Amino acid sequence: MQRITITIDDDLMAALDRMIEIKGYQNRSEALRDLARTGLQQASLEEGQMEACVGVLSYTYDHSARDLSKKLTNTHHDHHNISVASMHVHLDHDRCLEVSILKGKTDDVRHFADHVKAERHVTHGTLAVLPL
């Protein structure tokens, strides 16, 4: 591990210290390492350099919508090489939450997630992507 010295203006340092306290970091180094990892991951995504990833796709949908549950299940089965696990939660009488773990080429994972989120009666879809 390398030791470095950086200069940060007072306002930025105060904001960083607030974040450290709120998130419960042990020290500034841990917080800065996490921020650097997040920034590098985001840059890799934006530049298209992340070849493979793990994705967490979460979305809500109206389970009473005609054939939607069946259509979503078939989509997951048709992409069994990407969709590795799912958790289904009944939110209320009409709405369900699905959380799916996806693994594969980043472009394929994004395409799969976009397809699911675009289905009629699927709402609030979010994809979180992590590097492999």
From Swiss-Prot:
<dbReference type="InterPro" id="IPR045865">
    <property type="entry name" value="ACT-like_dom_sf"/>
</dbReference>
<keyword id="KW-0678">Repressor</keyword>
<keyword id="KW-0238">DNA-binding</keyword>
<feature type="binding site">
    <location>
        <position position="90"/>
    </location>
    <ligand>
        <name>Ni(2+)</name>
    </ligand>
</feature>
<keyword id="KW-0533">Nickel</keyword>
<keyword id="KW-0479">Metal-binding</keyword>
<dbReference type="Pfam" id="PF01402">
    <property type="entry name" value="RHH_1"/>
</dbReference>
<dbReference type="InterPro" id="IPR010985">
    <property type="entry name" value="Ribbon_hlx_hlx"/>
</dbReference>
<comment type="similarity">
    <text>Belongs to the transcriptional regulatory CopG/NikR family.</text>
</comment>
<dbReference type="GO" id="GO:0003700">
    <property type="term" value="F:DNA-binding transcription factor activity"/>
</dbReference>
<dbReference type="InterPro" id="IPR014160">
    <property type="entry name" value="Nickel_NikR_proteobac"/>
</dbReference>
<dbReference type="InterPro" id="IPR022988">
    <property type="entry name" value="Ni_resp_reg_NikR"/>
</dbReference>
<dbReference type="InterPro" id="IPR013321">
    <property type="entry name" value="Arc_rbn_hlx_hlx"/>
</dbReference>
<comment type="subunit">
    <text>Homotetramer.</text>
</comment>
<dbReference type="InterPro" id="IPR050192">
    <property type="entry name" value="CopG/NikR_regulator"/>
</dbReference>
<dbReference type="GO" id="GO:0003677">
    <property type="term" value="F:DNA binding"/>
</dbReference>
<dbReference type="Pfam" id="PF08753">
    <property type="entry name" value="NikR_C"/>
</dbReference>
<keyword id="KW-0805">Transcription regulation</keyword>
<dbReference type="InterPro" id="IPR002145">
    <property type="entry name" value="CopG"/>
</dbReference>
<protein>
    <recommendedName>
        <fullName>Nickel-responsive regulator</fullName>
    </recommendedName>
</protein>
<dbReference type="InterPro" id="IPR027271">
    <property type="entry name" value="Acetolactate_synth/TF_NikR_C"/>
</dbReference>
<feature type="binding site">
    <location>
        <position position="96"/>
    </location>
    <ligand>
        <name>Ni(2+)</name>
    </ligand>
</feature>
<dbReference type="GO" id="GO:0016151">
    <property type="term" value="F:nickel cation binding"/>
</dbReference>
<keyword id="KW-0804">Transcription</keyword>
<dbReference type="InterPro" id="IPR014864">
    <property type="entry name" value="TF_NikR_Ni-bd_C"/>
</dbReference>
<feature type="binding site">
    <location>
        <position position="77"/>
    </location>
    <ligand>
        <name>Ni(2+)</name>
    </ligand>
</feature>
<feature type="binding site">
    <location>
        <position position="88"/>
    </location>
    <ligand>
        <name>Ni(2+)</name>
    </ligand>
</feature>
<dbReference type="GO" id="GO:0010045">
    <property type="term" value="P:response to nickel cation"/>
</dbReference>
<comment type="function">
    <text>Transcriptional repressor of the nikABCDE operon. Is active in the presence of excessive concentrations of intracellular nickel.</text>
</comment>
